[in-house]
């Protein structure tokens, strides 16, 4: 992938990822390459355990959550440096001690 392609990434619907490790590898890549914005949607929700979900989140600095009709949106903030913060937003439902992830978005913002 070319560097100029990394400024903004919006995926096609992804339907071949079946494990949390696939998403974890993608998130690591996006963080390391300092992608300014991305969105990943799943045709079939990615099923993860609560432990795998926590591992995907890593060490965040703050969080916010809202739920409606069984769907939850969690937003996590990570301090990147003095001027920039990184945000991750997960849209999912929880059922039978599993988390079904529909979408993940990430973006960088200047701190206010």
Swiss-Prot record:
Gene3D superfamilies: 3.30.160.300. Coiled coil: none annotated. This is Uncharacterized protein 14. It comes from Sulfolobus islandicus filamentous virus (isolate Iceland/Hveragerdi). The gene is SIFV0014.
């Amino acid at each position: 992938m070319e560097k100029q392609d990394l400024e903004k990434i919006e995926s096609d619907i992804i339907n071949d990822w079946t494990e949390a490790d696939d998403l974890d590898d993608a998130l690591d890549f996006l963080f390391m390459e300092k992608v300014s914005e991305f969105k990943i949607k799943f045709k079939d929700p990615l099923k993860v355990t609560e432990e795998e979900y926590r591992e995907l989140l890593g060490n965040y600095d703050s969080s916010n959550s809202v739920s409606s009709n069984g769907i939850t949106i969690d937003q996590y903030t990570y301090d990147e440096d003095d001027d920039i913060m990184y945000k991750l937003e997960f849209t999912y439902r929880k059922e039978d001690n599993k988390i079904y992830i529909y979408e993940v978005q990430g973006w960088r913002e200047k701190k206010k």
